[in-house]
């Protein structure tokens, strides 16, 4: 631990540089301990948790995949995005927002309820290290995650967090603008009484009451570049223009996107349409198949993302009621997918 001596008690400037200062009873000798970025206004309302956990457990045994993943990513952009999450005005201090955000990622990857997540943080050393908790330190209870999610929804941070992580990946060269895949999937509602959700029909499956996640992903890496959440009955072509990123390259999509409005949006953003076509009376079947055949295997790559969500994360239905909470859950799934996908790409 670095030691710094001051001649007299002062207001530490380390609040501007990301460090916590502890003074002795005389105010002369102070120790400086790094901590995650947070604005000065809310810093006293949040707990400070022990980052020494990483050093303690590194000597105890081999690193886990979570340790590798944590070290690979730059968490500073997410920490800055979380600066507006306020702490408790009275009573017990709130948990650090970045630690809580990391805990929600763990809950997404391992399909954990709030109760299961709280228990896992108590028992699993790798989970503690990932979130920044020391070995013998107290961890959040179930209700803390409920309050934190409520704050994320109130402040509207789901999109900001997704963008912050995406910027971090882009700086590491993970997102290359050479092609874009677009698609959507229906996710069931938490309750048939959810008034923000809607029924969606499918020609080969039973109707589903829920929401629809619309995404755009990079053609080669499979990293998600944009995401939007709507009621399940929203048409894909309606949302497509808003999820197509700037300079998208070649844009691949299934027949649901065969519409003039999507073609115009692709061209306006500097891209080239590689959309599959619907059948028409004036279009011979052989010409239609010749157009669609080479596009089909490329377009279908995006379905691996939805497969991961639904099979690995068990994200077949929402946990919470309401569109705002559905958007948060979809963004968390997209962030969790991107982080794990980036880690696997680096290991390949």
Predicted features and spans:
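Structural motif
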Residues: 90-98, 205, 321-329
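Charged, often Cys/His-bearing segments associated with DNA-binding zinc-finger transcription factors
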Residues: 2, 6, 10-76, 80, ...
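Polybasic low-complexity intrinsically disordered regions
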Residues: 92, 119-122, 131-133, 140-269, ...
């Amino acid at each position: 631990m670095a030691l710094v001596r001051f001649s007299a008690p002062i207001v530490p400037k380390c609040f501007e540089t990301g460090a916590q200062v502890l003074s002795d009873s005389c105010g002369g000798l102070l120790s400086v301990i790094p901590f995650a970025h947070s604005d000065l206004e809310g810093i006293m309302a949040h707990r400070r948790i022990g980052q020494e956990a990483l050093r303690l457990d590194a000597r105890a045994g081999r690193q886990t995949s979570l340790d590798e993943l944590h070290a690979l990513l730059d968490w500073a952009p997410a920490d800055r995005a979380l600066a507006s999450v306020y702490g408790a005005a009275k009573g017990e201090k709130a948990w650090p927002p970045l630690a809580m955000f990391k805990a929600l990622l763990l809950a997404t990857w391992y399909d954990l309820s709030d109760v299961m997540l709280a228990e896992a943080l108590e028992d699993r050393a790798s989970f503690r290290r990932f979130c920044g908790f020391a070995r013998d330190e107290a961890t959040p209870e179930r209700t803390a995650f409920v309050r934190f999610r409520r704050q994320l929804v109130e402040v509207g941070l789901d999109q900001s967090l997704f963008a912050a992580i995406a910027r971090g990946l882009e700086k590491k060269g993970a997102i290359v603008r050479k092609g874009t895949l677009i698609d959507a999937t229906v996710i069931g509602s938490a309750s048939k009484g959810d008034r923000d959700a809607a029924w969606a029909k499918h020609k080969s499956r039973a109707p589903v009451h829920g929401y629809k996640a619309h995404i755009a992903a990079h053609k080669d890496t499979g990293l998600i570049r944009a995401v939007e959440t709507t009621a399940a009955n929203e048409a894909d072509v309606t949302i497509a223009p808003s999820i197509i990123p700037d300079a998208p390259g070649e844009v691949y999509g299934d027949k649901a996107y065969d519409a003039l409005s999507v073609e115009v949006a692709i061209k306006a953003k500097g891209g080239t349409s590689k959309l599959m076509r619907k059948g028409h009376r004036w279009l011979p079947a052989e010409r239609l198949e010749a157009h669609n055949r080479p596009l089909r295997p490329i377009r279908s790559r995006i379905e691996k993302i939805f497969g991961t969500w639904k099979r690995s994360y068990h994200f077949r239905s929402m946990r919470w009621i309401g569109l705002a909470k559905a958007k948060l859950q979809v963004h968390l799934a997209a962030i969790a997918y991107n982080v794990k996908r980036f880690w696997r790409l680096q290991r390949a």
